[in-house]
Structure formats: structure tokens, C-alpha cells
Design a protein with these regions (language model features):
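Extracytoplasmic
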Residues: 16-51, 68-72, 157-158
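Intracellular juxtamembrane helix-capping segments at the cytosolic ends
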Residues: 121-135
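Glycine-rich segments within core transmembrane alpha-helices of 12-TM secondary carriers
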Residues: 138-159
Length: 168
């Protein structure tokens, strides 16, 4: 794909939908392993749990969130995307707040479950489903462009978090 072809595709595609996809894949990072792993050591230290215990809690919460995603994810087919996206953002906000307040193993499980469901699951799902619903002919281009959001987050978010943690 040439630079000209890449940028010219925006003339035929809805830039708003691609930006929506980019933003949602970017912020899905809050529920992605690379992001949550940044807090692994401090959580284990705070709760006095081992790597294995943390891993078991993480795996169980992730598995449960994937099963729940099947049920919640299909709601996007019957709901206005703006409304669905609003609910997902609210859930991610609540999840992030709860994640910042982890004080027990049970709370850790709930927080990871909600972060994985809302961030990694529903944010990604909303982005991909919206792009797939809106685009027919250039679906692949639109999806690949919107998924640059996650790649960008994988670079930006760890640097940002490590920088912000220096102030604590």
C-alpha cells in the first residue's frame, strides 16, 4: 500500500468511525495484559500474594469475563452504538476506579474481571463491530487503521504510567 493510497482511503471512508475505532482500541489498553501487568508487583506486595496466586486470580477473572462477553457482546446488535459505547465507557470508568482501590483478594478478582470485560473485551468488541457494521468494501483497511489505536497504546501507556508513578 502506497502512502497516497493509504491517505486517499479516508476520502472514501468515514473518518469519524475510524477515529471512534482508534480511540476505543487505544483505551481498551486499560484491560489489556500489558497494562494491568504494570501493577502486578505492587498488588502482590500489598495483598501479600505470590506470582502463582496472582496468575490464578488473573486467569480466572479473564476466563469469566470472556464468557460474560459472549452474553453482553451480543447486545450491540440490538442497541444504538452510541448508547452501547456510553455504557462501555461508564463501565470502564467504574472498573478503573475499583482497580485503584484493591484491598483484598476478592476485590482483586472483581476489579480484574471488570477491567478485562470492559477494557480488553467490550472496548475492542465495540470498535471492531462498529467498523465491521459500517464498512463493506474497505472493511479490512478500516479495521487495520482503527487497530493502530492498540499499537499506539502499547507504546504510550506504559511510558505514561511509569512517568506518573514517579510522582507517587
Amino acid at each position: 500500500i502506497t502512502t497516497h493510497n493509504f491517505f486517499s482511503m479516508f476520502k472514501s471512508l468515514s473518518l469519524k468511525v475510524i477515529i471512534f475505532g482508534f480511540i476505543f482500541t487505544f483505551f481498551s489498553s486499560f484491560g489489556q495484559s500489558f497494562f494491568l501487568g504494570l501493577f502486578n508487583s505492587s498488588i502482590r506486595e500489598t495483598l501479600s500474594i505470590s506470582h502463582g496466586q496472582f496468575g490464578s486470580i488473573y486467569a480466572s477473572a479473564t476466563l469469566l469475563s470472556s464468557f460474560i462477553l459472549i452474553w453482553i457482546g451480543k447486545k450491540i446488535d440490538d442497541m444504538n452504538i452510541s448508547k452501547f459505547a456510553f455504557y462501555v465507557v461508564v463501565l470502564l470508568s467504574i472498573s478503573s476506579f475499583l482497580f485503584s482501590k484493591i484491598s483484598s483478594i476478592v476485590f482483586l478478582f472483581i476489579a480484574i474481571f471488570l477491567m478485562r470485560l470492559s477494557g480488553q473485551g467490550l472496548m475492542s468488541h465495540a470498535a471492531s463491530t462498529t467498523i465491521s457494521r459500517y464498512f463493506e468494501k474497505s472493511r479490512g483497511k478500516a479495521l487495520s487503521t482503527s487497530w493502530l489505536g492498540l499499537s499506539s497504546a502499547e507504546f504510550v501507556m506504559p511510558l505514561t504510567i511509569v512517568f506518573l508513578l514517579t510522582f507517587i
